[in-house]
């Protein structure tokens, strides 16, 4: 059974840090990471909605994660959101995150085109396969992704031994209970 203690506590989203020209500011990234360490949070969720992942290049996302890991690696649990608008870049970010030693990677479902549930599960499994030694977090955010995580793909996903958690941002609070009950002992549900 995996040790879930690294996921218990406050794990805030890590905000995007830009300079006056709108470029990722690595110095500000490091300052924010240092701030999180000083404040005593359990970890950080890097590269998600608050990190403006959809608007950043793969290189910007890699550099941001590298700076966060450099400052807070070993001090904070680091979950790297790696989803992109295509599977190949998502897998590239997943492999990069694993090479840095993050605790977990996470991904929203593919956006824009509404894919069938089996294709969403395959997308997530492909991404998690690019980081085979790293936990995977399913991110359920239907209000932005345009698709809600239902039980059939969830059940399919938890067959994957790397799937450790679901980050649930859906409105029905019953989803939290449903995912926890189905995920079982040792499965984490972030809210």
Specify the residue positions occupied by each region the protein language model found.
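Active-site beta->alpha loop and helix N-cap motifs at the rims of alpha/beta catalytic domains
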Residues: 2-12, 17-148
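Catalytic alpha/beta core domains of metabolic enzymes, predominantly
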Residues: 128-130, 142-191
């Amino acid at each position: 059974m995996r040790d879930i203690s690294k996921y218990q506590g406050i794990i805030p989203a890590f905000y995007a840090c830009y300079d006056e020209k709108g470029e990722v500011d690595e110095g500000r990234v490091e300052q924010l990471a240092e701030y999180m360490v000083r404040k005593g949070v359990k970890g950080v969720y890097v590269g998600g909605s608050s990190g403006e992942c959809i608007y950043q290049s793969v290189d910007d996302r890699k550099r941001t994660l590298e700076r966060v890991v450099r400052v807070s690696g070993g001090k904070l649990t680091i979950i790297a959101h790696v989803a992109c608008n295509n599977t190949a870049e998502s897998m590239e970010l997943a492999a990069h995150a694993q090479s840095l030693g993050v605790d977990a990677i996470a991904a929203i479902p593919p956006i824009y085109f509404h894919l069938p549930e089996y294709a969403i599960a395959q997308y997530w499994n492909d991404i998690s396969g690019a980081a085979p030694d790293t936990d995977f977090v399913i991110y359920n955010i239907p209000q932005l992704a345009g698709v809600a995580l239902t039980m059939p793909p969830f059940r399919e996903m938890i067959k994957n031994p790397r799937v450790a958690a679901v980050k649930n941002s859906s409105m029905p609070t019953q989803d939290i209970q449903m995912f926890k009950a189905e995920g079982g002992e040792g499965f984490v549900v972030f809210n």
